[in-house]
């Protein structure tokens, strides 16, 4: 009987420890920017879900494509219906690991890191290494940075009629302020 209680207590403590090691944000920010000959295109999404396991440095991100907001409604419509096909591919995801996360000290200092993993956009999976800056404190894990994506890598077709309006290389910036996850 004592063995059963010991197992149950160990299981419960393990779950409590794991819960304390996860950091989450539901309002992370991702922006993409396309600089082209005819016009610049910028879209913001402030409803990005991101979680970090502080024990392992594993990170997962989920972005709802329809949550990107554009300056012009027509740009948003074309983005969702014609390019990323949001009804067919409603989200973009990233699953990876912050390299050498365990060596990042809990301070208020910004540390340069690399995040390695797989990004999925438009149903296409690509391995990627993203440079980022991280600030790790007792209360939060802030991860921010920028990188470039190529539209062609994700099988996103741009009609030749508007090819001059959209850059082939898209600049992506992100800013996630993770707080301890509490169930």
Model regions: which residues?
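Bacterial Sec-dependent N-terminal signal peptides
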Residues: 1-22
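Low-complexity, acidic/polar, glycine-enriched regions of mature
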Residues: 20-183
């Amino acid at each position: 009987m004592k063995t059963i209680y010991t197992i149950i207590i160990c299981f419960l403590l393990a779950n409590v420890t794991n819960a304390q090691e996860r950091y989450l944000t539901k309002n992370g920010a991702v922006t993409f920017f396309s600089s082209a000959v005819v016009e610049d295109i910028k879209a913001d999404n402030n409803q990005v879900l991101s979680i970090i396991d502080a024990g392992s440095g594993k990170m997962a991100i989920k972005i709802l494509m329809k949550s990107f907001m554009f300056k012009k409604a027509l740009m948003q419509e074309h983005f969702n219906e014609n390019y990323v096909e949001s009804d067919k591919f409603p989200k973009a995801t990233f699953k990876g690991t912050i390299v050498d996360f365990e060596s990042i000290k809990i301070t208020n200092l910004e540390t340069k890191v690399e995040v390695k993993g797989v990004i999925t956009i438009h149903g296409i999976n690509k391995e990627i290494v993203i440079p980022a800056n991280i600030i790790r404190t007792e209360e939060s894990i802030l991860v921010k940075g920028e990188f470039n994506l190529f539209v062609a890598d994700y099988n996103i077709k741009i009609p030749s009629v508007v090819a001059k309006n959209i850059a082939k290389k898209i600049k992506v910036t992100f800013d996630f302020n993770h707080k301890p996850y509490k169930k």
